[in-house]
């Protein structure tokens, strides 16, 4: 079995590549990645020499590159995307190019090829914001509130149109917030962990009352694997972690695990269009595909913190580069 993975040097993508190669000894993966600021080949240092893995440097907007890399692949799993909300607020152009035009190129490749399934990794942010009650279902109307989420929602609608028009074997996965190993240190959880390891304060937007639904990366990889093999064409699957936590409470949990006081918290001005709450109803994927998250937040945070403590070689150069670029981004 052969899989074309796009964006496989990013956070979720690299964990998925490793997950698949570890689980399926006879699978092969071709990984296309543009190696933009968050794409890091060091994420896959341990499998570079694996004969089942091949890396292709390039952008998914490049039709010829995609066609050549696709070859006789059985599946495409599309992680390639610009994903940071704050960066999209400052400059949305890269998000439109990668997230919409890039998806279009992949869909055209599927339309003219013989792919068994095209799996697109979306986000819970396409649904917009929730109040204090209720959860997003797969039938919730899309109502994105940032340039980033608008670009992802646009890609989702394009995929829907290609399924309805051409009956392509497409499926969409909408995960909740992921956390775990190899996550770029501008994101909320690794930002807090690495700041504390460097004896720096941890910035929290507003009063820290925003709520996110968290899912450990290995659970998310298992969900995507399940959808790839068993998901029904034309469907959307919410892969939520069933773990809603206020940002401030999450920060306090990390401080407690790391033995730090709450004096390290620094409240900062809230960002524009900051969605109050995300929460995914994952009953469909549990019912139809028998997937459910297995790692509790306490266990996941402990494993994640331990990983960052043990892998300073990986995150410290990225952190220094962010500092040099004067990037003041703190949360997805």
Which residues fall in each region the model found?
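The catalytic Tyr-centered alpha-helix of NAD(P)H-dependent dehydrogenases
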Residues: 140, 144-151, 181, 185-189, ...
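A glycine/serine/threonine-rich, flexible loop-to-helix segment
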Residues: 47, 134, 185-193, 269
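Hydrophobic alpha-helix immediately C-terminal to the catalytic Tyr-X-X-X-Lys motif of short-chain
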Residues: 154, 158, 162, 192, ...
